[in-house]
């Protein structure tokens, strides 16, 4: 049987790479290689002395990246989560970089490959791991987690108002027989979510929540942001593409904190010119996909990109 081919459209492709303001001799990081759309465009803008290091947890993405690394000596791939950014770059002898790109969330090939268990559109083993070589599957977690933990995950990461009812139904069902497939979970959720948001399957929020939890997506995002910012050389840029409000909120709040001028009490006799300047500047407003891109790739509709740049100012006490 032939292996299915999945078309992956990279979201905000040119906008993200343009935001990095690529220097031909610079060192850049693509924290989420995926199928290499952003990485290939970055490489096309680098000169012979430029360098790109990419990260991914998905073995299928690593297979694609390995082929690219064999063709281009300027490119390195790291099979690890981006929360290991500082340690992995140190291992590669990289002390600072000129740009970091993060394209968060699950990729189109992962969603469209029914065997991965990310989507309720297919009947498949309930896996949801981005790295299928390690960790606990969604089915394994649902089989052992406390009802309260299931409820909290669905409520927090899915922003699902029916979390309590869904969690109770999951526990009741697993007492009869384990929930092992995407279809079983989707049907169960659909039976317990009475309202329907226009154009959205009732299982959408629950699947999102469990996927985020199984892959520790938000924890890893919180861990990598300060690492990426501190690795930037002066003038280096950080570009982060988010796909839902939970991710974007973390990015927005972190960048706001490190780009804010130092706050002093009103009575402090300090000239504005003498105040400590922030180590990070925000670059423009948040960027969204244009109408044409959304028409060609509906998944781009929820994408939002925030960009920041390292200043010459030193990191201040209290900066993350």
From Swiss-Prot:
| Matches recorded under Pfam families | Methyltransf_5
Q: What class of enzyme is it?
A: transferase
Lineage of producing organism: Bacteria, Pseudomonadati, Pseudomonadota, Betaproteobacteria, Neisseriales
Q: Where in the cell is it found?
A: Cytoplasm
The signal sequence is none
Superkingdom of source:
Bacteria
Keywords assigned by UniProt, alphabetized: Cytoplasm, Methyltransferase, rRNA processing, S-adenosyl-L-methionine, Transferase
- GO MF term list: rRNA (cytosine-N4-)-methyltransferase activity
Gene of origin? rsmH
EC number(s) per entry: 2.1.1.199
What is the source species? Chromobacterium violaceum (strain ATCC 12472 / DSM 30191 / JCM 1249 / CCUG 213 / NBRC 12614 / NCIMB 9131 / NCTC 9757 / MK)
**Main localisation, per the record?**
cytoplasm
Reaction(s) catalysed by this chain's protein: cytidine(1402) in 16S rRNA + S-adenosyl-L-methionine = N(4)-methylcytidine(1402) in 16S rRNA + S-adenosyl-L-homocysteine + H(+)
Q: Does the keyword section mention rRNA-binding?
A: no
Q: Which family does it belong to?
A: Belongs to the methyltransferase superfamily. RsmH family.
Enumerate the residues binding S-adenosyl-L-methionine. Answer: 36-38, 56, 82, 103, 110
Q: Which GO terms describe its biological process?
A: rRNA base methylation
Q: What does this protein do?
A: Specifically methylates the N4 position of cytidine in position 1402 (C1402) of 16S rRNA.
Gene Ontology cellular component annotations, sorted alphabetically:
cytoplasm
Please state what the protein is called. Ribosomal RNA small subunit methyltransferase H
């Amino acid at each position: 049987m032939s292996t299915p081919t999945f078309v992956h459209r990279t979201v905000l492709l040119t906008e993200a790479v343009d935001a990095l303001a690529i220097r031909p001799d610079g060192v850049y990081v693509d924290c989420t290689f995926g199928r290499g759309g952003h990485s290939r465009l970055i490489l096309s803008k680098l000169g012979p002395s430029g360098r790109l290091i990419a990260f991914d947890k998905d073995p299928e993405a690593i297979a694609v990246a390995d082929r690219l690394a064999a063709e281009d000596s300027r490119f390195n791939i790291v099979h690890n989560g981006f929360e290991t950014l500082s340690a992995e770059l140190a291992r590669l002898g990289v002390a600072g970089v000129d740009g970091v790109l993060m394209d968060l969330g699950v990729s189109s090939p992962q969603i469209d490959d029914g065997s991965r268990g990310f989507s309720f559109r297919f009947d498949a083993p309930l896996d949801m791991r981005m790295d299928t070589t390690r960790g606990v599957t969604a089915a394994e977690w649902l089989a052992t987690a406390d009802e309260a933990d299931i409820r909290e995950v669905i409520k927090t990461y899915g922003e699902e108002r029916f979390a309590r009812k869904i969690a109770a139904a999951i526990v009741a069902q697993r007492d009869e027989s384990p929930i092992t497939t995407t279809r079983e979970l989707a049907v169960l959720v659909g039976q317990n979510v009475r309202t329907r948001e226009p154009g959205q399957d009732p299982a959408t929020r629950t699947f999102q929540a469990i996927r985020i939890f199984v892959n520790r997506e938000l924890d890893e995002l919180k861990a990598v942001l300060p690492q990426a910012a501190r690795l930037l050389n002066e003038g280096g840029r950080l570009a982060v593409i988010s796909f839902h409000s939970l991710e974007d909120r973390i990015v927005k709040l972190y960048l706001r904190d490190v780009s804010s001028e130092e706050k002093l009490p009103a009575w402090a006799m300090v000239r504005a010119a003498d105040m400590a300047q922030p180590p990070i500047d925000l670059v423009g407003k948040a960027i969204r996909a244009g109408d044409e891109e959304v028409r060609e790739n509906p998944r781009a509709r929820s994408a939002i990109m925030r960009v920041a740049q390292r200043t010459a100012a030193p990191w201040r006490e209290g900066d993350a």
